[in-house]
Amino acid sequence: MSETFSPNLTFTEGFVLGQASFLIILLLFIRYVVFSPSEQIDHEGWRKRRAERADLLSNHTPPPLSNLLSKTSYDMSIHPAESSDWVNVLLAQILQGYRNDLLSEGGEEGARQRIEGWLNPKGENLSWLDPIDVTSLSLGTSYPLLSNARIRPADGQGRLRAEIDVDYLDSLSMTLSTAVLVNFPKPRFAVLPVTLGVELVSIGGTMSVQLHEPIEDRQHIHVNLLPDFHLNLKVTSLLGSRAKLQDIPKLEQLIVSRLRNLVQDRFVHPNHISLALPRILSPSVSSTPILEGLGEGAVDAMKDAVSDGMKRMVEDFMGENPVEGALNGQGEEQWLDDDFPPTPLVQPPGTFPTLSVSSRQSHRQSLPPSRPQSTTQGQPQLFYRRPLIHPTQSYPHYNTYTLDPQIPHSVSYRHPPRGSHVHNPPETPVPQRPSHGQGRMSTTSSLTPSQSQSQFRFRGQFASGVTPGQVGTSR
């Protein structure tokens, strides 16, 4: 006769034992599989191995420029020259901004005084020259025009450059007045008044824009004029006090030659203006790299958003309301002393509106959070609290409060149906007479649905206005 084995554990004990075994296995899996070992990590060795791996991966050969042209669908042999009208607009705005800066204080007179300050730096007066006075100044009204932009080979090493025709026709003029001093045999022994006028009539040529190899881990754009440029200047001169010499040819040639050499030495190929591009992974002109600055800004924005969201969630969950503190705190008496009628506020869903009484007696009583008080006339007043909601959201069912005339000082709340459209809360509830067959008085919004929806509708700062064809159309 065989004996049958009967377990000693009950169902509850077996269930608990099974759950405990599952939890132990889960904890062991997380401890030894998910988490890293608790041994001390060799940080120095890890950094060295990472640096060696970065050195091996840094030997990257850049693709040839022909690959760049093929991927941008640009064929230098057949591609026509392009218009640069959009660049002209941007360049005109930049130049007009500089003109506005000079003319911002006092117009041309203020600009003249500024240029005089630049021409006469403090502590650097010349012994043989009087201070320079700017007698007239004209900043012009035209803008440089760029045209015929094309890509051309820069040298025999496969580099490319953009060639753009530039023309500037205007009348930039400035007239200077000073005096040349002869300090021998004594200071200011002789004084020769000099008046010079320089006018820029036109300048033009071919501008070259080329991206050069990195210098000190930074890429640079070189901008210059090709040697076939033209410069048209007009110079007027006036020397002497009583007997004056006007427009001396030699002096005019000397000034034009000096100004042309200045342009030649600064802006004409092989000389150039170098514009450094900002770095991405290393410090640029500012002490903070671009990606690092963007990363810090993104982290700060996320921190603020998370903290604000958590704060709002906690306040909504706990039922805290800054309006309630204002009503029950120190500002209650001052609020009751106001001669204007109180503005009904909005109560969040799931709670009941607060009934309070604005008593005009000398003895002020604190308002309880949810218990009504009666006035001398026996008519309570409603004070609805405003919920903590986002400005772009609103809840139409906040206004559906009703008063039951059969029960004194009673307030009921009616939830809206699910899926109802979201509207803005009204500014002031307007009581309406009960319809035939109903014994309740409801409060409705004084705003139309279209006005309520458009009150907090987001419109970007740069959003374009509604076109005439879109007025009155439904979305």
From Swiss-Prot:
Identify its protein family: Belongs to the MMM1 family.
Protein's name according to its UniProt entry = Maintenance of mitochondrial morphology protein 1
User: Which parts of the sequence belong to the SMP-LTD domain?
Assistant: 80-278
Query: What InterPro entries is this protein classified in?
Result: Mmm1 (IPR027537), MMM1_dom (IPR019411), SMP_LBD (IPR031468)
Q: How does it assemble?
A: Homodimer. Component of the ER-mitochondria encounter structure (ERMES) or MDM complex, composed of MMM1, MDM10, MDM12 and MDM34. A MMM1 homodimer associates with one molecule of MDM12 on each side in a pairwise head-to-tail manner, and the SMP-LTD domains of MMM1 and MDM12 generate a continuous hydrophobic tunnel for phospholipid trafficking.
Q: Where in the cell is it found?
A: Endoplasmic reticulum membrane
Origin organism is: Cryptococcus neoformans var. neoformans serotype D (strain JEC21 / ATCC MYA-565) (Filobasidiella neoformans)
Composition bias type Polar residues, residue spans = 353-380, 394-403
Q: What does this protein do?
A: Component of the ERMES/MDM complex, which serves as a molecular tether to connect the endoplasmic reticulum (ER) and mitochondria. Components of this complex are involved in the control of mitochondrial shape and protein biogenesis, and function in nonvesicular lipid trafficking between the ER and mitochondria. The MDM12-MMM1 subcomplex functions in the major beta-barrel assembly pathway that is responsible for biogenesis of all outer membrane beta-barrel proteins, and acts in a late step after the SAM complex.
Instruction: Name a GO CC annotation attached to this entry.
Output: endoplasmic reticulum membrane
Q: Which Pfam families match?
A: MMM1 (PF10296)
